[in-house]
Amino acid sequence: AGSIKHGLEIMGLALVDVHANTCMMLRAHQTPSTKELKLRDMNQVKHYIDVISCYKKDLRKVTDVIVADAFFSIRTFVDGIKEHEFHLVSRFRDTADLHYVYTGPRSKKPGRPKMLDGKIGYKELDFTRMEKLHIEGLEGSAYTLIAYSKALKQKVRLVIWIMPNGKHKLFFSTKTSMSGEDVLYIYRSRFQIEFCFRDAKQFTGLTHCQARHKNQLDFSYNASF
């Protein structure tokens, strides 16, 4: 009952004000069914990239950062939005393959310069390579560094949040110039979109439309938002 049924879900594209902690829905798109995606010779992630590309001109006037949950922390999506000049703020799985970046002197030996300097072990973190973050209201402790993601094949601004129970969460931005504080603030602000969905369901009939035609459904979703 709680599983995702492609073709019966919608993708919401919204603008979030991190400082005011508010959200405004811009557009909703119905996710194509698996059959329709197959006919288009694309997958769900490619569909999401195409939707973003449709609004990139207007979005780029406001921001160059897209925030999304861990589902989108894959190379296909990161590379796809990079083509449209967007960076991603998201979360890695807790066991992500991440490496310290080598910052020492360049060797005079021939060949490719050394880039990686050991895998990040989450049970034995090297805090000398990190900067501790001081974030009001955050339980536990948080550290930031520039790390290399094997999955994304690129450097990222990484934030490691160590919770009071000893477990950790990994947040990142593909915009390495972004501060660790901003990575956390931006990722946490993405939950504001849930209030847009909640209000549309409770007050403006988001789930009440019984139409079957795609255009009618599209109008109903966006009118609700």
Predicted regions: what is each one?
Residues 1, 13, 65-72, 88, ...:
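Short, conserved catalytic/metal-binding motifs centered on acidic residues
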Residues 1-28, 158:
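Acidic, metal-ligating active-site segments
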Residues 25, 77-79, 100-102, 157, ...:
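A short secondary-structure junction signal
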Residues 46-50, 170-176, 181:
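Short, motif-level signal for alpha-helix interfacial/capping segments enriched in acidic residues
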Residues 149-177:
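Charge-patterned, long linear interaction tracts outside catalytic cores
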Residues 180-211:
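Short amphipathic alpha-helical "interface-anchor" segments enriched in bulky aromatics
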